[in-house]
């Protein structure tokens, strides 16, 4: 039986900034519907890899493929349209816009009405705007943000801002969702709720998810496989149990707390 083609693949990917190799020889695969963790010490290259996968950086070696199509050199907005969306370690919402408008902005990448219809205020413009608003409200309901939809994003509590950023990333209708430390700054109860939310949206939207996170209870609790980076190179890959007991991982990152 032939092996399944990965949905997202990084093949011997690396990037060099001047004389510094930030990543080297990174190979990883994500298959449809998987929820995969990416862990490692600070400075290991995790966010750099996300920046490569989303077109913020261009690899100096190797290639990145989505559905078998090479993405190297494509600008971030084209990669978003092809099906990769992300959140950021530092929240990047439009603080002065409402919660609703933050989600609607993401839908414009897939807007069916043209710029001309918007300029001339044609009926198709109003139909398209109404459709986007209805979809945005649907997402806000899922993320329990519908009651604050008219609030400015900057006025939300931290946990709600995190949920809004995930809702906005989902509104871009991705095949692959990259979550960069979504539990950062959350208390244990918020983290527990986030775990349930991530599992729910994966099933609801048939998502493939790659997750960077330092909260090991979250990673070990919801991820099927985990990749481990250290000094820009992959040092391990496997199930949570395999990674937890890997001597290289324990030495580089986890320590005795999970051994």
Residue spans of the language-model regions?
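Glycine-rich phosphate-binding loops of nucleotide-dependent enzymes
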Residues: 2-259
């Amino acid at each position: 039986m032939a092996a399944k083609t990965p949905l997202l693949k990084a093949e011997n990917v690396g990037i060099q900034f001047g004389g510094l190799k930030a990543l080297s020889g990174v190979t990883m695969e994500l298959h449809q519907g998987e929820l995969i963790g990416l862990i490692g010490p600070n400075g290991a290259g995790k966010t750099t890899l996300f920046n490569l996968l989303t077109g913020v950086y261009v690899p100096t070696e190797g290639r990145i493929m989505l559905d078998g199509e090479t993405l190297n050199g494509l600008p971030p907005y084209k990669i978003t349209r092809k099906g990769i969306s992300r959140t950021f370690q530092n929240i990047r919402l439009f603080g002065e816009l409402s919660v609703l408008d933050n989600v609607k902005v993401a839908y414009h990448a897939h807007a069916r009405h043209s710029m001309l219809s918007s300029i001339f205020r044609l009926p198709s413009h109003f139909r398209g705007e109404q459709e986007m608003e209805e979809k945005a409200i649907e997402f806000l309901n899922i993320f329990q943000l519908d009651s604050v939809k008219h609030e400015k994003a900057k006025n939300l509590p931290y946990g709600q801002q995190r949920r809004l950023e995930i809702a906005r990333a989902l509104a871009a209708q991705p095949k692959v969702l990259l979550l960069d430390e979504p539990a950062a700054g959350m208390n244990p109860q918020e983290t527990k709720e986030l775990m349930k939310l991530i599992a729910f949206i994966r099933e609801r939207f048939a998502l493939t998810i790659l997750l960077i996170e330092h909260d090991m209870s979250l990673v070990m609790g919801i991820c099927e496989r985990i990749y481990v980076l250290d000094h820009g190179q992959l040092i391990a890959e496997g199930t949570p149990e395999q990674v937890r007991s890997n001597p290289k991982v324990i030495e580089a990152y986890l320590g005795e707390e999970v051994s």
